[in-house]
C-alpha cells in the first residue's frame, strides 16, 4: 500500500530556545516596548517570561493557540453562579421579550449564561444549500464509502488518488471540506409474519440482538464550504442594499451549484447522496439540517425546513451544554443527559496510508470524528513551505530530517502531484455516565497511540474543540496544521462497510440483517440489485455458493437463511396485482448427515429420510405423461443400465425407449405399479447375452440388488402437501453408494424442479459436490443455474471442500452463475483452490485462512459489493441454536419424532424442544 510522508515540519511551530517563534516574538516585542516607553527595567522580565514559556511549551507545542482559543470562550464569571461550571444555554434569555406586567426578578440569573447559538454559524436554508452568517455556502453529501476489508491494496490506493485529485482540482477556488464519521446507536429489525411458533420465536429473539445497546451505525458525511467573500469583502457586502445582496447571493448560489455538480461527479465511486429537502406526511424536512443538528447534540432527529434563522432553532434537542476542564455534559430538553469528551492530535505519525484510521470504526464507542481541510492555492502553499523552512533553519531547529522533508514537499508541490491545506482533527466520544465516557475516551486515546498518533484529551480549549465540529466555524479550529492533500485523503479515506439493501429487493425486504465487525447492520439478499426498485421482478439472479470447513458454521448459516426466507411465504409479501393462486413459495433442502432434520421439523416442513437398502417409495413411472417427463424418464432409465460406463447401441436404446413409451402410454398412472418390472415385460431385447440390456435392467427390478430404489408400488416423492412449504430430503446413505447416487440425485432433482412454475422457489443443497458429481445430474444443475431465475427461483449450494467442489464438471459455470459467494473460515484452505477455482483475490483468500472459525464470520462476495458479516445467535436461546444444526447425538431421537405419524406440528415441536432442553 502506498504511503506518504506526513511533513511533520508543517505540523509543529518553528522553535527557538524551546519556544514557538511567533509567541516568543510577541513577548519579546511587548517587553521591549515596555522598556522603551515605561521603564528600562521592564526588559528584565523577558528572561523569566521566556523560561516560563519554554516550560509550558515542553508540555504542548500548540498550547499558546489553545490558550488563545480559551480566552475567546471566556464568559461572565457570574454565569457560573448557578451551575458552578461554564454553561451554554440553547437560547439567549436576554433576547426574550420582557413582560412589563412582572417585576424584573433574577433569582437564578439565566440571562447571564451565554447561549451557544452564537457558535452556530448557519443562517438560511436555500433548498439543499445552507448559507452562514458570514455568507459562506454549505452543501453536504452522505457517502456509503468504499469497502476496504478484503479489497486489493491497488484498488484502495486508487480511491485515495481520486480524493487527492478532487482536492487538487479546487486549490484555485475558495472552498473548504469537512469530513465527519459519526458512529451512533442503531436499532432495526425486519417485519415478518410467520405462521409458525418456532420461526416467530427465533425471529423475535434474533432481532433482540439488534437493540441500540448492541448495534451501531457508521455514517459518513462530506461537507463543502464555499467562501465567496474575503474578510474585507464581507464587511463591504453587509453594507450593500438588500437588492444588491440578493442579486450577488443568487450568483454565489449558482456558482455553488456548479461546484456541487463537479463534487458529486468526483464522489461517484463513493456512492454519495446529497442531503437536502424531503417530504414526510406533506411536510418539508431537511436531512442537511438534521446532520448539522446531530453535530450539536449527538443524536439524529427529524428537522423541519423553516424560513426562520437556522441558528435560532437548531439546538440538537439540548437545553444546556456544561463544560468542565475535560468533559461535557449534554442536557437534553426531555431531561436526558449524556456526557462527552474530546480527543485531539498532539503529534502525527511519520507516514500516512489510506485508511490509517479505519481501526477506530471497529470500536464499540459512539463518536463523531471531524476532519476539516482548507486547500491553499499553489502559490500560497509554496510561500508557506518556504517560510516554514526558513523559520526552522533560522531558529537552528534540531529537526534536520523535517527540514529535508520540506524540500521534498516543495518538489511534489511543484510537480503538481499534491496540494497543501490547513487541517484539524477531533474525536468527540459520547457516554451515558462520566465513568463510561472516561473509559471509552481512554480506549480511543490508546487506539490512536497504537496507530502511531500522539493523542491527548482536550482540556484547555474544550468548547472550541466541540463547536469546531460545525462546518464553517473556521476561526475556532484548534491545533490547525498544514498537511498535504494525500495525507488528508488517507486520513479521511471514505472507507465504509457495505450495507446491502433493506427493501425494494426482488422479493421485497431483505432476507435478514447480519452484523459487520463494526457492529453495523448488513441487509442480506440472495438476489442481485439491478435497479432502484426490483420488487416483483422475477428474472434476477440469486444463485449462491456457501463455502466453509466443518465447524465454521456453514450448516447453521444455511438453515438460518432458510428459516428467514420463510417469511416470503406470506401472501402479504407478494405484489398486490398478482393473482391469489400465484402467491406461492416452496423451498427444498437436500441434506447430508441429517444436519437440517431438526430445523425442517421445527419450521413445519416435511423431512424425507431415505435409508440404504430399504424401499425408497420412488416410482418414477407415476409421473404425468408429458413430453418433458418422458424425456427425463428415458434419461433416468438409461442411467440405470449404463452406470458402469456401458454404451447402448442404437437398437438397444430404441428398444428401451419403446418399452418405456409402451408403459407410459398404455397404462393409466395408477396402473403403473412397479414400473421397471413393467418395462422389462415390454422389453423385446434378448437376455441370453452376458451383461445384456435386459440383465442390466433386471438389477433394478423388485427383489434384485437395486430393486428397492425405483421399482416400488407407488411414488411417495410428492410435494403436494397443502400446508407444507418446506421439504428436506436426506441423501446420506444414497450418496455414499456410488452405484446408485447419480440416478437417485437425478430423480429427486427432476421432481423438485417440476415445481419451478413461477412461484417463489429456493433449493438448498448441502455438500453439493456429492449430489451433483454425476455428469448427467451436473448438466441438469448447470441448465437450472442459468434458467431458474426466469422462473423466480434460485439455488444455494454448500460445500466444505473446495477441492471436492472443483472436481464437479460444472464448477466454473456455478461460480459464473452465482449472484453471491459466502466464504466462511478455513485455516487449511489451499490457495490454488480458493484463488484458482473460486476466483478469489489474494485478500479474500487471506480472509478465509486467517479468520477464526469460532468467530462465525464470513465474507459476502457479490458483483457490486463485498462485506464481512456474521450471524449473532447469542440471543436466540440454547434450544433454538441446537435446532439449527442437528448433531449426531440427537439424530436417532429426532428420527423417531419425525416418523411418528400420530404427532401434529405442535406436538413434534414440543417433543423436539423437550429433547434438547433435557440435554
Residue ranges and their predicted role:
Residues 34-43:
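Transmembrane helix interruption/hinge and helix-loop junction motifs
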